[in-house]
Amino acid sequence: MNMSRTRRLLVQSFIGITATTLWGTALAANTIRVGPTNAIKTIAMAAATARDGDVFEVESGDYRGDVAVWNKDNITLRAVGGRVRLLADGMAAEGKAIWVLQGARMTVEGFDFSGAQVPDRNGAGIRLEKGHLTVRNCTFTTNQNGILTADNPNAELEIVNSEFGYNGHGDGQSHNLYVGQIARLTVTGSYFHHAKVGHLLKSRAAVNDIRYNRLTDETGGTASYELEFPAGGVAYVVGNIIQQSSQTGNPHVISYGVEGYKWPKNALYLINNTLVDNRPNGGVFLRVSPGEVTVRAVNNLLVGRSKLDSAGPGDYRNNFNVDWDEFELAAREDYRLKRQSKLLGKAIDAGLVDGLSLMPDSEYRHPREVTRLKGKALHPGALQSFK
């Protein structure tokens, strides 16, 4: 056999193997339509028949009492034709949640979870028990917990462009978002508001990356903490609007390490946030429990009388207490600086951690979006753009 023919046969074999592999992958990743006009009419049926790698496209509409346990790996669920509204209507998978997730990896997009209530007061829109969950463009309202995770050191939760409001049983033990001792929590471009006595966001994760969000307990809000990291861990809190309601029963806006430091590395980086205290008698922007912890707070705007450095030892630089009139329309949560503000251009470099810059490269845009900055962040606070 001559060399050219040998080479040709090798190429043909490679093409055949590649095509077979791609075809097998395509077959494995089935795309399945779910809805009243399809063979699979309910989400519960979809979960019961799911195979690893399946993609479910769920037709828009109301799905009442349609609860499910998902235990397959690499599952994608996305709404098509509009929003998919999941109303618990007194039902809960395994007595826990509208959805209970037990697979290795799952992506959920375009769903509205509401009304999860169970006797133990921990009913959730989603209960994450293992694996990696990505939630994108979803809402969680009037549940006892919006999302609740188990304690699983290998689990990860990513939340993108989503909304959490009016969740909580009212006992202070259930929250808009309640994350246990997992490996990592990432939240970007999301809107948290009006938790019912509980917190807007509570996490015991080893790493918490909270960037470019709006966490504002607004008129009528009764949330406790806006952000709590009771077990410590590493928390990057960058470019967020964080507002405490006038009706809160808890003076603290952000709390860190109150249960003791449970992780090997404990550090809080509070960079370029706008922190607002509406409590009539004044609140406390930051509480940090004593221990082996790094605190760095740079370029934050503080609407209220409290100071960040009252939390204890740390690197506190370039944080400004400001009045309401620095902003375009603070009464409507528009915290863009006015064009004539004397704070413009006064941001400083917040430094690096593990070789990566702490400075924001994006900003939150309401509702539930993130916009990339055209240049570097020049101003203190969460928002760099103007009216």
Model-derived regions, located:
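Right-handed parallel beta-helix/beta-solenoid
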Residues: A19-M45, T49, S60-D62, E326-A330
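N-terminal hydrophobic targeting signals that begin at the initiator methionine
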Residues: N2-S4
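Extracellular beta-rich repeat passengers
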Residues: A44, V55, E59-S60, R64-K387
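Sec-dependent N-terminal signal peptides
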Residues: S13-I17
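N-terminal export leaders
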Residues: T6-V11
